């Protein structure tokens, strides 16, 4: 997934790429790019598959470690790709906000 909108107190950017995996209702992802050297998240989907709750931890390019928790609303774009609207709360610093992510097109798809 890629970031399409970032809250001013967020640190993900258009350069941040997230690679998700799912096993039943458990979801994990590794992400990096922009000011994030490496990040991980782990969470669960609700029974309807309409929302995702997770905690994340990340290290930035300066070596600072941050963590937070999020709730994402899951929807679909007209072309069927996933769209996540994340409401996040920092646990290691003040602030909360909203980020938006969309599933990237697979290689060979029309742009």
Go through each PLM region and give its residues.
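Beta-sheet ligand-binding and adhesion/scaffold domains
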Residues: 1-19, 51-111
């Amino acid at each position: 997934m890629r970031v399409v909108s970032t809250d001013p107190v967020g640190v993900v950017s258009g350069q941040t790429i997230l690679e998700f995996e799912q096993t039943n209702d458990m979801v994990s992802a590794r992400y990096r790019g922009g000011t994030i050297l490496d990040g991980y998240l782990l969470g669960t989907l609700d029974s309807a598959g309409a929302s995702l709750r997770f905690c994340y931890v990340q290290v930035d390019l300066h070596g600072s470690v941050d963590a937070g928790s999020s709730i994402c609303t899951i929807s679909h774009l007209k072309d069927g790709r996933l769209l996540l609207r994340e409401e996040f709360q920092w646990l290691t610093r003040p602030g909360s906000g909203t980020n938006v992510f969309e599933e990237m097109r697979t290689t060979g798809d029309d742009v």
